[in-house]
């Protein structure tokens, strides 16, 4: 016997690298290339840090109300957490307390199985089809809950509302958790379905479309009943998860709708041009509705390309995982950054072709 | 069957009220009456919020290093969390994964049993003696871990290092978690015992002595091995728990040792004067080593006094709980605030005495 016998054994999630080099093109963690609204700067500068001696609002009351108004929901339908990872984690702990398996696509956010291991939640991976599409009919089996990212990471593919409604309808005895971290980049939010389904919980984040990954704000929306249970678990975990500065910066973000929309449109435009350029270079690219693309080249091993990009100080994401080990996920940066990526790829593919020719 | 069947049932912690009134004397959540160092204001004003588009360091690297240096520890012996409540919560999840009960005093921080319920950890409350003292010999029974607050809340009593070492020695097969949230107000930290015991984990916070409850920074110190396990669980829960602003404000706090020490001494001085005044009014007061006092008056029901104080806009803390339902916990505020409390109590006790006289 030793204290080591009482440890919870887990295999933790490994987040995308945050390299300390400064002259890199960082396209590996789906951060927004543009800053948050300047209102955030203003609010932060004006904040009197003497107020930090006091605890923050336990439910980020004012921000919570503003989010409810923004989405035409009741305040009781909203809960804010310390980034969407915390919201997801506490949702798993709250809602998936079943002997039946939680269902999730086999290709999706790799944190889900880690939450399951942490909380001892049985789960079952449901294979997507050869085009990485989620097949609705596969989610009509016995389960203790369902989690789907829409759009998905890393595939970047989105589901339509009709498909999500079908899943909700067929699973009224399970919570269906839809992770909409990337929804603002072209997907269709399922928040309107909250009017009809009390088993729907939708998670969103300030990290991507609102350029606030550094301040850690995630949100879940659901029926007032579902959210009240999530609050009970949150209040059994941490009374004050959102610090006072994060609360005011979140509010600042909501005040500048014009900048928010402009920022998103810029990224979508860059994505579409980047996709066209990739296709012209012979890449296969999924129909991205996110701020990243998922790509594959028939003539180049993804792992080799990943390393070549890394050496050129362009950091993207690659997983050594069945079905996607020949694919790369590339975040959409600025136009200038994406042009540099295309230039690099052109040179790389040309050199590769020459070597192939020479081998013949 | 319904989705409600799969819910985790919990009875959440209820934090001390954060009233929205402005002209109150707020002595109910052990906040510091003085602001944090002015370096925090400076750092915050200068921060460029454009950097918030990027994720923060997953382990608050720079702050972690500074804390290690401050306490003459290795960086691997330090983990930072989103307030000490998160650090405690993740410590329970990591270390107390046993069939044997976790031991804790019966009178202590009331969040501990709530973590146990959340994570299904068996626990056993060990009665303190009639003077609220923790009896070391009672912790030499079979257990899956031990958690003790030093100084304790709400009793305000501290243990000495010899007693803590005795517990560590007798329980080398269990993690002994010492919650030092209030240690800077007169207790003796057990951090030096980390040199000898790899089963010791010490939790501290920026919320009390550093006047930073609003920014949510808690810390655990332990052996490099214990902390690495805590990191594995943290990284299975949330990759980025500390936002970028909290990290720089924590660093600002560590840069102003002079202000920090002065602030603590002021509070201790106010506490000692307040205690003397209370004793002169006939109160029983425990030997506080914290930024609050735990008090009882032989002639007045605590609950009635709590209500009378509340009506006078002086908010303190009372628990309807066996053994302490006739006690109040009062945070140490400014001299001016504590003088007002004494003035109120004088008037209240005098009126009470007159009523008693009249009844005869």
Curated annotation (Swiss-Prot), chains A, B:
**Which residues are annotated with the PTM N6-(pyridoxal phosphate)lysine?**
208
What GO molecular functions are on record for this protein? histidinol-phosphate transaminase activity; pyridoxal phosphate binding
Instruction: Name the enzyme group at the top EC level.
Output: transferase
EC number assigned by the record? 2.6.1.9
Q: Which family does it belong to?
A: Belongs to the class-II pyridoxal-phosphate-dependent aminotransferase family. Histidinol-phosphate aminotransferase subfamily.
Q: PANTHER family from the xrefs?
A: HISTIDINOL-PHOSPHATE AMINOTRANSFERASE, HISTIDINOL-PHOSPHATE AMINOTRANSFERASE 2
Indicate what this protein is called per its UniProt record: Histidinol-phosphate aminotransferase
Q: Which organism is it from?
A: Lactococcus lactis subsp. lactis (strain IL1403)
Q: Which gene encodes it?
A: hisC
């Amino acid at each position: 016997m030793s204290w080591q016998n009482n440890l919870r054994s887990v295999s933790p999630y490994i987040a995308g690298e945050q390299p300390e080099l400064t002259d890199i093109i960082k396209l590996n963690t789906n951060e927004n290339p543009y800053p948050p609204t300047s209102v955030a700067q203003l609010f932060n500068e004006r904040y009197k840090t003497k107020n930090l001696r006091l605890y923050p609002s336990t439910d980020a009351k004012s921000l919570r109300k503003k989010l409810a108004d923004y989405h035409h929901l009741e305040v009781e339908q909203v809960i804010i957490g310390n980034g969407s990872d915390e919201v997801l984690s506490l949702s798993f702990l709250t809602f998936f307390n079943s002997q039946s398996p939680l269902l999730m696509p086999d290709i999706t956010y790799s944190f889900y199985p880690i939450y399951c291991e942490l909380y001892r939640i049985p789960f079952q991976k449901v294979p997507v089809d050869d085009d990485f599409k989620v097949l609705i009919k596969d989610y009509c089996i016995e389960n203790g809950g369902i989690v789907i990212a829409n759009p998905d990471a890393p595939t970047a593919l989105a589901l339509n509302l009709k498909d999500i409604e079908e899943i909700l309808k067929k699973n009224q005895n399970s919570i269906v958790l839809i992770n909409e971290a990337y929804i603002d980049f072209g997907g269709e939010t399922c928040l309107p379905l909250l009017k009809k389904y009390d088993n729907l919980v939708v998670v969103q984040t300030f990290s991507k479309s609102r350029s606030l990954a550094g301040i850690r704000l995630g949100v879940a929306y659901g029926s007032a009943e579902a959210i009240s249970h999530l609050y009970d678990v949150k209040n059994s975990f941490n009374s004050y998860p959102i610090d006072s500065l994060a609360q005011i910066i979140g509010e600042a973000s909501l005040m500048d709708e014009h900048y928010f929309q402009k920022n998103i449109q810029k990224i979508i435009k860059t994505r579409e041009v980047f996709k066209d350029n990739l296709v012209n270079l012979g890449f296969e690219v999924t129909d991205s509705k996110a701020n990243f693309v998922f790509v594959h080249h028939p003539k180049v091993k993804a792992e080799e390309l990943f390393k070549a990009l890394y050496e050129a100080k362009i950091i993207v994401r690659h997983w050594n995982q069945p079905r996607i080990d020949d694919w790369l996920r590339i975040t959409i940066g600025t136009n200038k950054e994406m042009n540099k990526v295309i230039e690099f790829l052109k040179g790389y593919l040309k050199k590769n072709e020459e070597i192939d020719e020479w081998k013949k």
